[in-house]
Amino acid sequence: MAEYQNIFTRVQVAGPAHMGVPLPEQDSPRTGKKPWQIHLLGRLGMAQIGPIYLGPLGILSIVFGSLAIMIIGFNMLASVGWNPIEFFRQFFWLALEPPSPKYGLKLPPLNDGGWWLMAGLFLTISILLWWVRMYTRARALGMGTHVAWAFAAAIWLYLVLGFIRPVLMGSWSEAVPFGIFPHLDWTAAFSLRYGNLFYNPFHALSIAFLYGATLLFAMHGATILAVSRFGGERELEQIADRGTASERAQLFWRWTMGFNATTESIHRWAWWFAVLCPLCGGIGILLSGTVVDNWYLWAVKHGVAPSYPAVFAPTIDPATLQGVK
């Protein structure tokens, strides 16, 4: 007998394209005349592509974002002598570095960090325009603005890393370079410089909310998949009539841990855990160097960590190795 399994999407319903709700008179038209469907996307979610509403904010966001990506990309290409083969071979190690400490908050020459400043400006404008677009689209649809404010939490962390903290520290060299491995190297050097971020309480909270959000998402996703044979994935119907799917899902968690979330509260829990991850992370980064110079010594002072004897020679301050040389 075949067993019902739905870890991967098995069934696609091919129906007529949905054009969306009517737009207000003052809005620009949607992009794309006729939506189309892609079977592979239907295995992950809705197979329909379009129509897309860009509007002036969306178009400007894409323009500024494209300029930022081009500046970063061409600088990386220039760093390998305009060799496309080396560009792809070394891509994960290439970077566009911030200015060196000697420039402080001044405008440096383009090749000494000026390109980094320009790319960061364009990227920030692009992200903020996209946020405004998300907010206005939610309002136009009569929705709440929960998605926009969740995105704002991520923007907060981005601005702390690349703008707010460098300004408070008085140097653009404190910011993160553009690049995959280089930004990871920056993170490791940052932790070493400020005495191990593991002793930063806001870093600990950020990781707790990160793992918590992952756990909640896994619990919620697994529960809905487990009762989808009873129609549990049709949440609109379940709100009006809990039916056997929601009853079984809630009964399962009451049986296993003595408590169950509701169809609404699980989403509120997940939203808060996900939002608090970058919010706490941004606070922890912002306090490093501005308020606390060494998180390990801070932890020793407050009885969080033991005091270890000095065995090895002091390491070189990573701050002296950052920025464009």
From Swiss-Prot:
- Gene3D superfamilies attached to this UniProt entry: Photosystem II protein D1-like (1.20.85.10)
Q: Main site of residence? A: membrane
Per UniProt, where does a ubiquinone bind?
W253
User: Mind listing the GO molecular function terms for this protein?
Assistant: bacteriochlorophyll binding; electron transporter, transferring electrons within the cyclic electron transport pathway of photosynthesis activity; metal ion binding
Name the Gene Ontology biological process terms. photosynthetic electron transport in photosystem II
Topological type in the membrane: Multi-pass membrane protein
Q: Which domain of life is it from?
A: Bacteria
Q: Which residues bind Fe cation?
A: H220, E235, H267
Under the heading SUPFAM superfamilies, the entry gives:
Bacterial photosystem II reaction centre, L and M subunits
What do the Gene Ontology cellular component annotations say?
Answer: plasma membrane; plasma membrane light-harvesting complex
Which InterPro entries does its entry note? Photo_II_D1/D2_sf, Photo_RC_L/M, Photo_RC_L/M_CS, Photo_RC_M
Spell out the CDD domains in the cross-references.
Photo-RC_M
Spell out the subcellular localization from the entry: Cell inner membrane
Alphabetized, the UniProt keywords read: Bacteriochlorophyll, Cell inner membrane, Cell membrane, Chlorophyll, Chromophore, Electron transport, Iron, Magnesium, Membrane, Metal-binding, Photosynthesis, Reaction center, Transmembrane, Transmembrane helix, Transport
User: Which parts of the chain span the membrane according to its record?
Assistant: 54-80, 111-140, 143-168, 198-226, 260-286
Q: Which residues bind (7R,8Z)-bacteriochlorophyll b?
A: H183, H203
Q: Does the keyword Cell inner membrane apply?
A: yes
Pfam families per UniProt: Photo_RC
So what does this one do?
A: The reaction center is a membrane-bound complex that mediates the initial photochemical event in the electron transfer process of photosynthesis.
Subunit: Reaction center is composed of four bacteriochlorophylls, two bacteriopheophytins, two ubiquinones, one iron, and three highly hydrophobic polypeptide chains (designated L, M, and H).
Family affiliation: Belongs to the reaction center PufL/M/PsbA/D family.
* Annotated protein name in UniProt: Reaction center protein M chain
